[in-house]
Amino acid sequence: MPKTIRIALAGLGNVNLNLLRILRSQATLLADTYGLRFSVVAVCDSSGGAAAAEGLDIDTLIATKEAKRGVASLPQGSPSLVAQTIVETIAADVFVEATPVNLQTGEPGLSAVRTALQKGMHVVLANKGPLALAYPSLALLSDMGGDVTLPKMRFSACVGGALPTINLGRRDLAGTVIESVEGVLNGTTQYILRSMEQGGSYAEALKEAQDRGLAETDPTLDVEGWDAANKLTIVANAVLNQPTNVRDFAVTGITHLTAADLQAAVANGERIVLLCRGVRNAQGSYDLSVAPTALPSDHPLARMSGWEMGVVYHTDISGRASATSAERGPMPTAAAMLRDLIDVGR
């Protein structure tokens, strides 16, 4: 018999909606290969929430959202059932946080995540806000602080979607000294830069990215480098073991670049990317930065298309380790959340 894992979902936008679709389509695989069955006992969106101890019907949840209705309209629904209420009152094994990112206060996700961990729930996040603003305190409430008896906290979806940035650095390179990490961790700017390389202006490339659904109506966090900076902050805390706030290092975006800049780099045998970088210094800490950077054309991150993100770790004994991921929608991020759910469920 598969082990039943009760999950509570905060947020039911594209990411968690696709997670539900994956849980439905992969149910037999999850049971047969991993011995796991996931039961959605609570969910909330902007309308309120719904809960059922026996589990909500996934088909009904998906159909409700596809019909543009809120989950509070369900028979088990209530407009007062928000994320904080769910973690305080609902019996669940895992809290799955995918509400919109708030990089000012981290709320409401931060408080809900903290409460869930304090109550003994495992946590899986796609919302990077709580981690970027409060990683050290959340780590101490979870196994990420070193105490494996505490609830697990997983967040691989927060740093490059399906790209295994955290797992590669934290798990697969265990026992090494990471001399440096380089990453292209923002898909919007990667697409814009590769489009500008073909001769289009920044404004034209941005509009194209928006038309394709790759850029927000207000792209400020992406194009000014702050989304990438928040991801680097998470890497610094979780992989490099360096307590870091996003305001601790220099961040430069791409809005000043022109097509001529991109094409001149290509003519010089280079490509410009928005590079997240952490370099170990003589004191053993890491100098962090986010900035457009010209890389040699044979560099792994310079070879990527406009649809790809990637990370490269340089280590003392394992040499260079790199990974890339091509993503054209929210499904890979949802797949990363499934990876984390399997991890905490086993």
Mark where each language-model region is.
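N-terminal glycine-/serine-/threonine-rich beta1-alpha1-beta2 phosphate-ribose binding loop
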Residues: 1-118
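Conserved active-site and cofactor/substrate-binding residues in soluble primary-metabolism enzymes
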Residues: 10, 14, 18, 38, ...
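General beta-strand structural signal in soluble alpha/beta enzymes
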Residues: 94-97, 124-126, 153-157, 180-183, ...
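Rossmann-fold NAD(P)-binding glycine/threonine-rich loop
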Residues: 100-119, 128-155, 169
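Rossmann-like NAD(P)H-binding beta-loop-alpha module
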Residues: 142-150, 154-215, 226
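Substrate-binding/catalytic subdomain of NAD(P)-dependent oxidoreductase enzymes
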Residues: 195-196, 206-303, 308-310
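ATP-dependent carboxylate/acyl-activation modules
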Residues: 299-346
